[in-house]
């Protein structure tokens, strides 16, 4: 099985790396209240750098298992995160990380907008166990 890869480093070698703005999109048509945009790369295959993204959730929840760390910084609203029986509630300015190899559950009873950083995934292991639900 071939594994899709991205460059080992997402940097361009230039003095400044610039990623132009793009709008957030619904992840899938059947998940209308979950929107995102990946800023510097798509989380496909392996990567040795970080991946930056922005997410919005409107009265919905999401869970997935990821092989890399996932750090969320809440910009607006209120976000609940649960992993391994521990739950935290983020308010604007708060951040939390689900560490590699964990199932993370994220939900916004009303609305949440967050900036997310995926840590390195040098083996290219895939995220899985996706579940979307509306509140």
Regions found by a protein language model. Give the residues of each.
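Double-stranded beta-helix
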Residues: 46-49, 109-135
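Short, conserved beta-strand element in jelly-roll/cupin
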Residues: 56-57, 65-82
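A short, N-terminal "cap"/entry segment at the start of jelly-roll beta-barrel domains
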Residues: 1-54, 134-135
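Well-ordered beta-strand positions in beta-sheet-rich domains
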Residues: 54, 87-89, 103-105, 111-113
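Short acidic-glycine-tyrosine-enriched beta hairpin
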Residues: 85-101
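Short beta-strand His + acidic residue motifs that chelate non-heme Fe in jelly-roll/DSBH
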Residues: 63-64, 81-82, 98, 104-109, ...
